[in-house]
Amino acid sequence: MSPAPPPSRGRIRPWLVVGDLVVAAMWVCAGALVKLAVYGVLGLGGRPEADAVKVALSLVYMFFFAWLEGFTGGASYNPLTVLAGALASRAGPSLYLFAAFVRMPAQVFGSILGVKLIRAALPKVGKGAPLSVGVHHGALAEGLATFMVVIVSVTLKKKEMKGFFMKTWISSIWKMTFHLLSSDITGGVMNPASAFAWAYARGDHTTFDHLLVYWLAPLQATLLGVWVVTLLTKPKKIEEEADESKTKKE
């Protein structure tokens, strides 16, 4: 079964709030289950093949969530994805406000609910990966990783690639690359909702370190990434109009 075609851009779709909440809860549960399978069930902690198995399992559920996003018409587990989409669509302040003040809080609440459920069912999943470096080092790492991921994600959307497999494959491999590179520093989260949910479970969700590293840095990186892609990728209509006006002048 193929994903449903994406809805037209720039529309406020209230039903996505429920979809965001459910998908965000499912996402944190999926990530926790993969870690539990790799380090608990398979006992690969500290072994070189642990990362390979983790990547393979993660790619499977990343494809599932990409399909789920298309099937639901845009439900997402990551506030940065919603924010980047609203900014890149140029649909005006209403869509941006809907994303920032309705959809993103729903994703945060869904992530918290997911963490509570998975920890109640499987206490061995732990409380997530806390920041293991200084706050400024962590903010730089999380911001840079987010910036690189946003650039590729927004570019793929603007190019409107028709192949679901290839588009998802490129995006997933790119995300996993930067997740692995930053996993020993910040956990490689690149998802404020998920990071907040695990921090809430640990009780450090209101600290300055958490807000700077997992919220301010990735949000700024998202804004910068969307701006860079928008600057470098000129819409075809604008290019055609510029060519036509140039031809008329000649």
From Swiss-Prot:
TM stretches of this protein: 14-34, 55-75, 95-115, 132-152, 178-200, 211-231
Main location as per UniProt: membrane
Keyword terms, alphabetized: Membrane, Repeat, Transmembrane, Transmembrane helix, Transport
Membrane topology, record value: Multi-pass membrane protein
Pfam families named in the record: MIP (PF00230)
Any one GO cellular component localisation term in the record: membrane
Motif (NPA 2): 191-193
Intracellular or extracellular location(s): Membrane
InterPro entries, A to Z: Aquaporin-like, MIP, SIP2-1-like
Expression tissues: Expressed in leaves and anthers, and at lower levels in roots.
GO molecular function: channel activity
Location of the motif NPA 1: 78-80
Its biological purpose: Aquaporins facilitate the transport of water and small neutral solutes across cell membranes.
Family (UniProt): Belongs to the MIP/aquaporin (TC 1.A.8) family. SIP (TC 1.A.8.10) subfamily.
Entry domain remark: Aquaporins contain two tandem repeats each containing three membrane-spanning domains and a pore-forming loop with the signature motif Asn-Pro-Ala (NPA).
UniProt protein name: Aquaporin SIP2-1
Species, as recorded: Oryza sativa subsp. japonica
